[in-house]
Amino acid sequence: MDDKKNKMDALVAAVVVFLCSFAVGHAEGEEEAGVVGSRIVGGFEVVRNSLPYQASLQQNGVHYCGGTLINAKWVLTAAHCEITNVHIIVVLGEHSLGNVEGKEQTFVVERAIRHAGYDSTTVDNDIMLLKLPRAAVLNAAVQPMQLPRAGARLEDETSCLASGWGTVGNGVMPDALRAVYLDTTSRSYCNDAYSGTLTDNMFCAIYAAGGRDACQGDSGGPLICNGALNGIISWGYGCAYPNYPGVYTKVSNYITWIENTIANNM
């Protein structure tokens, strides 16, 4: 019992340390590698503009989190991607971070609305809406992703696609958008890995052999399962460890919150 409690305390502490380092590092425009949760390792570069829902969140021209366009004026991301007192820039139609390719649409976020129940210790309710100052121009490179049904449940071993510009290994950030296929895991398997710290608003996905995962800089980005935005990249222990799945915000639990928030902030 003491060993299990110590493991759980260590995991919670690691998440707290990560979130603090995330806020400090990105307030200074820095990137940190090898920490918990900022959660692509072992993936592949996608065909240019083949994931038209993908958003890049940037500060001072530096990518730091992902997001997903869910309609022409709103992007969904993780609550821990909020940076206070700093303008968040959203870039849609992005592929190469280092090159202007003519498809990009850039916005200074008009309003960031973090879920009121977000807990930085447990990382519960890790979800945030970003309102754009004008509607995005929808075209082949920029399209919203549909949301799942409220309360929808994914079967174990459902194949999903995570994407982003996060670390590919040894702290190296890629220039081009990458993606990785992962399978959802049973709740019991994931809860055992994280000593019972999962809440009902979280689910997990993993590549069983290890070596593939979302990682530093992918946070807030999409996990697409069954053609819908079922998950938001949230946290995990390291990146691509065989016995530690990535943890994702369960979007189907927030459909009413998303709809009401948008309706109340037109």
Predicted segment positions?
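Classical eukaryotic N-terminal signal peptides for Sec-dependent ER targeting/secretion
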Residues: 1-19
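N-terminal signal peptide
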Residues: 17-36, 266
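Conserved H-D interstitial segment of serine endopeptidase catalytic domains
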Residues: 33-34, 38-39, 57, 75-78, ...
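Extracellular trypsin-like serine protease catalytic domains
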Residues: 36-41, 54-62, 149, 158-266
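Extracellular/periplasmic catalytic domains that process cell-envelope and extracellular macromolecules
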Residues: 46-50, 69, 82-84, 120-123, ...
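Catalytic histidine site
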Residues: 47-87
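Extracytoplasmic
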Residues: 50-52, 85-87, 92, 104-107, ...
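Active-site substrate-binding loop(s) of clan PA
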Residues: 101, 116-119, 135-174
